[in-house]
Amino acid sequence: MAHQCACFHFFLCGFICYLVHSALAANSSSTLCFWFPLAHGNTSFELTINYTICMPCLTSQAARQRLEPGRNMWCRIGHDRCEERDHDELLMSIPSGYDNLKLEGYYAWLAFLSFSYAAQFHPELFGIGNVSRVFVDKRHQFICAEHGGLNSTLSTEHNISALYAVYYHHQIDGGNWFHLEWLRPLFSSWLVLNISWFLRRSPVSPVSRRIYQILRPTRPRLPVSWSFRTSIVPGLTRPQQRKVKFPPESRPNAVKPSVFPNTSR
């Protein structure tokens, strides 16, 4: 009897452990993070974008119909005309997680919005899938995306910019160019922010100081004030005359004016 109870408890504990392990495995997720310096703020909102998913109409019938009310010069691939309902909405939620009321700089906003869009709608760009949420680690200034895959297919041997370029041009050929225009600011703003962060914290070298001194604008010259006494230097306003040497005993005395001319006006 005791042996049966021990076996029952053993199988019961094993079953409970299996359920817990399955639940943890189902909820397990990996995190992909990007470091964006100078990213602070406290806001959460949703961004909705209306965009057409139609290609330009190329047929003569569509060219005539585009002038009619309710028609458009853009039509779906394989169709000869475009209706008013031939559009789509892109709904993107902007995550919260900031403690200030602003993002410091336009590039921080641009990078934040671009990464949020790319992680939610094009996670394959980063070698991930099934992105559950995008959040911010304000302590380390990380913008992260939680995804369901345990391993990322993004090879560490390749540059993310090169992978982006290949993926971008491949998607352009596939007809998704209107989606991926949002991905350009991600890498440009990321580069600008990191370069700015590096330049702010790097010591000033003598070369940079010299360039600054050369390129520093000069002060504008102030108007000359004539309210002080001036003396006329002989020889500046009169033509130069030949010098005559006098003997020491016959040297003429220089006459000094007793009163200087008033030039305060």
Swiss-Prot record:
GO CC terms in record: extracellular region; host cell endoplasmic reticulum membrane; host cell Golgi membrane; membrane; viral envelope; virion membrane
Keyword Methyltransferase belongs to the record: no
Location in the cell: Virion membrane; Host endoplasmic reticulum membrane; Host Golgi apparatus membrane; Secreted
Its biological purpose: Minor envelope protein.
Carbohydrate-modified residues: N27, N42, N50, N130, N151, N159, N194, N262
Main location: virion
Source taxonomy: Viruses, Riboviria, Orthornavirae, Pisuviricota, Pisoniviricetes
Organism: Porcine reproductive and respiratory syndrome virus (isolate Pig/United States/SD 01-08/2001) (PRRSV)
Protein known as: Glycoprotein 3
Gene symbol of the encoding locus: GP3
